[in-house]
Amino acid sequence: MNTNDTIVDSFAPGSTITGPSGQLAHPETIEHSKRLVKTLYRVGDNAWSLVGNGLSNQSFIEGPEGLIVIDTGECDEEMAAALAAIREETSAPLAACIYTHFHYVGGTQALLAEKADLPIWGHAGIQANLDRFGGEIAPRVTRGLVHQFAITMPQEGPDGVVNVGLGNFFRNPDHAPFTNGYVPAMHTFDGPTKATIAGLDVEFYPAPSDATDSATIWFPQLRLAVNNLLWPALFNVFAIRGEEYRDPRVLIRGLDEMAELGADHLIGAHGPPLSGQAEIAQCSRDYRDSIQFMWDQTVRCANRGLTLNEIIAAIQLPEYFKQHYTTQQLYGVVEHHVRQIYTGLFGWFDEDEANLFPVPAPERSQKLIEGFGGLDKVRAAIDAALAADDYRWAIELASWLVRSERNARGRADAGAPEDRQRLATALRGVAYATTSANVRNWSLTRALELDGSSNLERFRTHRFQKRELARRPAVESVGLLRVLLLPERAGDMEQTLRVIFTDGGDVSLTIRHGVAVPGNRQDAAVTLSLASDHWFDMMAGKLSLNQALADGVAETSNDADVQSFLRCFDLESLNS
């Protein structure tokens, strides 16, 4: 068991160098970017993988009847660039498209411009996963993406983006305006499936990893596998952006099944391909072993009764796993993965008494400051910790000061500018000294907000996009209001509103006892009638309820009743 007071693998003060654009970062972080530069790799005689065109790879398998495209990236522009690259190598006609998982399906329309009836294959769960991230939890998901993938960070200077772990950027700036070209798969599977595609035998094996709909794709005639299991960095059991639990045991099964294929070539959803049975076998073995190590040791420590803060200090990967970049902490860090494994298995309570009924914020911070001897003593301790590169302690102390008062939006995040700067400095200390792209990007994004260089408030409110709402029936979007209900406004209201869409469809929503639930149209005493297009405009903040009523594009059974009902929701356009 490791008994060090610090967890050196998460960040190592004093290990900072300057990158090519003036970025301050760990040398391994800067070195990792070289693996992610745009390169079209030839994989055997019949396949190519384009790395560095975007966050993910676009890969191509040539069969007797044409070219199979695997993953289409974030947007049509990304896929169009990939097509241009592959056309330098082969003129084979497009024969099919396959999705490895739902993250990289946004550029498919670019393929249909070349072949309108292109067959598309993918897991049956892709659509549900896409829908899951676009509705109720959208602000939290978006904010997580902004932090993890450096979306608001500068491109140059000490705080400049180096990479995002699995790629050099979330979206390649050359691909603006990032046109969404997702097309659903028409050939789906949810279990092992065999097919003939482009004249090649193809086998699909569901293999959940960072997505429940991931699949390993095996081309037995080519001895080639395409996967989303083995990444160019230690697997992210925990994603700092916020994700559901990824059970390492499920991932390990997928890796073991993939290893049994005995591939000569291995293409990933991210990073350079691997070739040679021996190298692939060793990388696959070490990858699954690194993940099992984290799971096994977390369980061992939990069984012994250690709290989470003890467990993270007790578990570090053996030095052996630093031999190859695929098991290095270039994306996330072990101590965060350990926390996720523990909470995934046992929930948030780690048997530390202090966590059972903690004093809520901001009162907790106020009590800690008082107990420490007051603001000046806390500030002096922070400054001493910063001088000693003790960034863990500096962050904890500075967070007391920043979170000791509520801001105008009600969050405990209103500390004095000088204290926000102290916290920003401590976070930068971590960011410049970690191998983890996730940690660097999260810490710098927060530091830039703390010191006033950026404003992230727009990511803390629901900002519905009309084009996203319009992709589904209007009746579905009414249900999204559930998570915007303000109980203090609803009070003891028990009322049902029926929304009638003049171009087809209607839905009822009931407010009762502080919740909004699906309603029964027979119980609706209040009605709102309008075209779905105008409803989408209201949800997206392009049209207010009052303006819709004044312009006559919305009609009600009683204006005041509808206004009173919709005022209960935290959406400005429904309150004005």
Regions found by a protein language model. Give the residues of each.
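Accessory terminal helices/loops
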Residues: 2-30, 138-142, 151-159, 163-175, ...
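Metallo-beta-lactamase
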Residues: 66-68, 74-76, 131-206, 250-262, ...
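Divalent metal-coordination and catalytic microenvironments
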Residues: 46, 61, 71, 86, ...
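Conserved beta-strand hairpin/beta-sheet module of binuclear metal-dependent hydrolase folds
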Residues: 37-90, 215-229
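Feature captures hydrophobic
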Residues: 384, 388-396, 412, 420, ...
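Short, hydrophobic/aromatic-rich segments at coil-to-beta transitions
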Residues: 43-49, 199-203, 491-498
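Active-site metal-binding motif and surrounding structural segment of the metallo-beta-lactamase
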Residues: 65-66, 77-122
